């Protein structure tokens, strides 16, 4: 069979070919991200199918380190449509994140010393693997958010003015 008539579908892909499945856009607004880390996820089969279908919400998610393991809490993955109640997963199940021991220790030290938090930023495919980008961040105050909005608005106005001329 020839591939002459086939066209590739357009998807959310970044420069290096990874397909973005979900993104936590609110996290960059509410937190000042100091460091990022790519981790794997320990998932069930129905969770993988739901994530690939884009039925995941990272908005309220956060990570904790317990017993030298990173755990992902409060991330909603909708149940898979074609699986029965017995075989389906729990939507708010706590998921284990896969990272190297040294990376976990580094995160643990920074969380204890500086009072930071770990937030899920984006969920994407890397090859056939589902990866989660987490960020170590410090919460922003309301006035910091307002200042950030003013800076972004002024940059946008300057860019629009330059575009007209």
From Swiss-Prot:
Disulfide bonds: none annotated. Residues 1-21 are annotated as: Disordered. Belongs to the SmpB family. Coiled coil: none annotated. One of its GO terms (biological process) is trans-translation. Its main location: cytoplasm. Pfam families: SmpB. One of its GO terms (cellular component) is cytosol. Residues 1-10 have a biased composition (Basic residues). It is found in: Cytoplasm. GO terms for molecular function: RNA binding. It comes from Prochlorococcus marinus (strain NATL1A). It comes from the Bacteria. Keywords: Cytoplasm, RNA-binding. Required for rescue of stalled ribosomes mediated by trans-translation. Binds to transfer-messenger RNA (tmRNA), required for stable association of tmRNA with ribosomes. tmRNA and SmpB together mimic tRNA shape, replacing the anticodon stem-loop with SmpB. tmRNA is encoded by the ssrA gene; the 2 termini fold to resemble tRNA(Ala) and it encodes a 'tag peptide', a short internal open reading frame. During trans-translation Ala-aminoacylated tmRNA acts like a tRNA, entering the A-site of stalled ribosomes, displacing the stalled mRNA. This is SsrA-binding protein. SUPFAM superfamilies: Small protein B (SmpB).
